[in-house]
A protein has these predicted regions:
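Conserved kinase catalytic-core helix
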Residues: 51-59, 93-129, 134, 138, ...
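Conserved structural core of kinase catalytic domains
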Residues: 41-44, 62-106
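Nucleotide/phosphate-binding site architecture used for ATP/NTP-dependent chemistry
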Residues: 1-15, 59, 189-195, 200-201
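Conserved hydrophobic "DFG−1" position in protein kinase catalytic cores
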Residues: 16-19, 24, 66, 84, ...
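Short, glycine/acidic-enriched loop or turn micro-motifs at the edges of active sites
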Residues: 69, 86, 128, 145, ...
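C-lobe/activation-segment region of protein kinase-like
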Residues: 139-208
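ATP-binding glycine-rich loop module of kinase domains
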Residues: 5-45
Length: 208
């Protein structure tokens, strides 16, 4: 069985092992060992529970394999074993598609995010780097920063992130892509969230 590292961040190393992703949280040597273990386990548990919840809601996210459904905790304290989504990362491929296909993809992406928010799941890192197209489905990955919140502000900030990402990375068709995202984004709180988004953006401009 071949295992290779495909990514390393500040918090975790990501390995590919056949058709599975292993996310191994990195120990922090500057922290007290017992405290570090607690922090890593807490973050591991939170990410696992949110991924499990999203999958149960039939959202297009990776399956989690090492999760104890009965106890609602991961079976490992510092790693997650996830489904490998072998598709096209949108940050690399979106601009190469026809405009019609790009807009259709963004509409699907918006629908997925709307379902996350309907169930109070905040992703916190919504970019096309964390979105993969596979067999005409749009998968959202990397829930490492995700959390549960009912706050309109938090949902608005989530949308602000994808809006910024589109403007920075896919600026050529930015307006069409963002409008397509909003077309797909359905939530009972959509009006309130978009109103709050305007406030968030004004606040950001004021800071700069």
């Amino acid at each position: 069985m071949v295992t290779k590292i495909i990514c390393q961040g500040a918090e975790a190393k990501i390995y590919l092992e056949e058709d599975k992703i292993i996310k191994q949280r990195i120990p922090k040597t500057y922290r007290n060992q017992i405290l570090d273990e607690k922090i890593r386990y807490s973050r591991n548990k939170k990410e696992a529970k949110i991924l499990y919840k999203a999958k149960k809601l039939n959202l297009d996210v990776p399956k989690i394999y090492n999760f104890n459904e009965k106890k609602q905790i991961p079976q490992d304290k510092d790693k997650l074993i996830l489904e490998y989504i072998n598709g096209e990362k949108l940050s690399d491929f979106l601009d190469s598609y026809s405009l019609k296909k790009q807009m259709n993809i963004m509409k699907k992406f918006g629908k997925q995010v709307g379902l996350l928010h309907e169930n109070d799941i905040i992703h916190s890192d919504l970019t096309t780097s964390n979105t993969i197209l596979k067999k005409n489905k749009v998968y959202i990955i990397d829930f490492g920063l995700s959390y549960i919140s009912k706050k309109i502000e938090d949902k608005a900030v989530d949308i602000h992130l994808i809006k910024q990402a589109l403007n920075a990375k896919h600026y050529k068709n930015y307006e069409n892509l963002y409008l397509s995202f909003l077309e797909g984004y359905n939530s009972n709180e959509k009006k309130e969230i978009l109103n709050r988004l305007e406030i968030v953006e004004k606040r950001g401009r004021y800071k700069h």
